[in-house]
Structures are given as structure tokens and as C-alpha cells.
């Protein structure tokens, strides 16, 4: 294999591209492009001029972690011991209705903050699911002082919201 110079290689690429009518690839952008991009796209201070490209500072808001994922049986027992009201969502990652109702659960966790909301993946923690006879996903169990009060089987938002509202502590 012979070694050729870079200019010779570029010449051969160009001649191949022109002979087969293929578009010539842009091999190396001008450094001026990077300089102008650095001035406009990465400028964190707000722009005061009325130019075509404007910059904007971004702030992110911390996400509320109001629904907690439990990964073992001990976490489940601790949650029941440490909170007066606990709503448990038994779900599976492959379950479509579980994914569909998850945003509603997060919304209700903000509206009814005195209930502790937890999720238990039945594939990761099967012993807890078996202990409470979970046969379908999603299954929601409401606990008060560590004792099961009620349950809702299936993604039924009106029934679940009624359960939460009826058992929500006032303080």
C-alpha cells in the first residue's frame, strides 16, 4: 500500500465525485463558522440588539419527586411504617395502561400531598406483589397506618380519584 499526500487524496476524491455526478462532500468547514457560532449560540447573557439571531438564558426547575419508586421489600415495609397514608401503584414497565395513568398519579400527588405515593415494579419486587395478591396491572392499594384500606384494579382514573379524595387526610 502506497502512502499519498493529503492534497493528492483530495484531488482523487474530487475527480471521482465529478465523474460520477455525486455531490462533493464538504470536507472541512471554515473556522469562521465556529467563531460566529460561539459568539451567538453559547452566549449566556441576554441580547439587547434586534438581530436575526438572539440568545436566551435557560433555567431549569427542579422536578418534584412526589411518586417514589421502591426497589425492594424492605423499602416497602419502611414506607408503610413511616407514613400514615400510603398509595401503592403496582405496575410493570411493559404495561401500557400503567404508563398511561402515571401522569395522573403524579398530578394527584401534588393535589393530595398528605398521602405518600409509591410505585412497585412487579417484575423487580415480585414478593411484595404476591403478598398482596396482585394479579393485574396496574393495581392500586391504599394503606392507612400500615393496614390495607382499599384497592382499585386497572387504570380507572375516576374510581382512583374518588378513592384518594375519600381517604385524603385534611392535614
Swiss-Prot record:
UniProt KW keywords: Cytoplasm, Disulfide bond, Vacuole
Induction: Expression is induced in the absence of TRX1.
GO molecular function, one term: protein-disulfide reductase activity
Localization of this protein: Cytoplasm; Vacuole
Family annotation (CDD domains): TRX_family (cd02947)
Record's GO cellular component terms: vacuole
Disrupted-gene phenotype: Leads to reduced growth rate and reduced conidiation and impairs appressorium formation. Leads also to defects in response to light/ dark transitions.
Residue ranges occupied by any Thioredoxin domain in the UniProt entry: 41-169
Cysteine disulfide links: 95-98
Recorded family membership: Belongs to the thioredoxin family.
Function: Thioredoxin involved in responses to oxidative and cell wall stresses. Plays an important role in appressorium formation on hyphal tips. TRX2 may affect invasive growth via the MST11-MST7-PMK1 pathway since it is required for the proper folding or dimerization of MAPKK MST7.
Protein name listed in UniProt: Thioredoxin-2
Species this protein is from: Pyricularia oryzae (strain 70-15 / ATCC MYA-4617 / FGSC 8958) (Rice blast fungus)
Lineage: Eukaryota, Fungi, Dikarya, Ascomycota, Pezizomycotina
Gene that this sequence comes from: TRX2
Amino acid at each position: 500500500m502506497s502512502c499519498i499526500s493529503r492534497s493528492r487524496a483530495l484531488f482523487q476524491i474530487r475527480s471521482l465525485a465529478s465523474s460520477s455526478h455525486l455531490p462533493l462532500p464538504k470536507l472541512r468547514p471554515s473556522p469562521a463558522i465556529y467563531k460566529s457560532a460561539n459568539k451567538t449560540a453559547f452566549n449566556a447573557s441576554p441580547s439587547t440588539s434586534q438581530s436575526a439571531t438572539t440568545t436566551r438564558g435557560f433555567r431549569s426547575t427542579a422536578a418534584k419527586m412526589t411518586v417514589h419508586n421502591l426497589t425492594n421489600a424492605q423499602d416497602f415495609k419502611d414506607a408503610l411504617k413511616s407514613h400514615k397514608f400510603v398509595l401503592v401503584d403496582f405496575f410493570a414497565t411493559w404495561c401500557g395502561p400503567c404508563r398511561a395513568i402515571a401522569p395522573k398519579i403524579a398530578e394527584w400527588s401534588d393535589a393530595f400531598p398528605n398521602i405518600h405515593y409509591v410505585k412497585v415494579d412487579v417484575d423487580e419486587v415480585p414478593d411484595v406483589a404476591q403478598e398482596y395478591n396482585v394479579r393485574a396491572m396496574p393495581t392500586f392499594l391504599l394503606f392507612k397506618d400500615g393496614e390495607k384500606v382499599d384497592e382499585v384494579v386497572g387504570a380507572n382514573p375516576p374510581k382512583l380519584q374518588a378513592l384518594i379524595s375519600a381517604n385524603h387526610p385534611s392535614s
